[in-house]
Regions:
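Cyclic-nucleotide recognition modules
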Residues: 47-106, 110
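Regulatory nucleotide-sensing modules
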Residues: 1-44, 50-59
Length: 115
């Protein structure tokens, strides 16, 4: 039930060509989750690929600060994205859902830091 509410406000994407998701130093308007495919991350003059099954823009979303990296979805990436303002509203109205969703984001962050 609760997860359906989050998916209801999500937009599905299926990229046909590289698509910018976040730009370092700017506050992202969307949070992304890559289900299949990859994204190219550029940070501190380094580039690397992440995905599938990763969030993009989660740190900026959690701490309400600009993105720490520029990220492009590669062609053929599939997933969902949420407008951050809509997601924030939904989670503010559903505290238990917010705890669970923030837990997913934190788990994703921890796994990235461990690599």
């Amino acid at each position: 039930g609760e997860f359906k509410k989050i998916l209801k406000i999500a937009d599905w994407f299926d990229t046909q060509s590289a698509e910018q998701t976040t730009t370092e130093g700017e506050i992202p308007e969307r949070l992304y989750f890559i289900i299949d495919g990859e994204a190219l991350v550029a940070r501190d003059n380094k580039e690397f690929f992440v995905g599938p099954n990763v969030f993009i823009g989660e740190l900026a979303y959690l701490i309400k600060k600009p993105a720490t990296a520029s990220v492009k979805l590669t062609d053929k990436a599939v997933g969902v994205s949420w407008k951050t303002s809509n997601l924030t509203k939904l989670l503010a109205a559903n505290p238990q859902m917010k705890i669970a969703f923030d837990g997913l984001l934190n788990q994703d962050l921890a796994s990235k830091l461990a690599k």
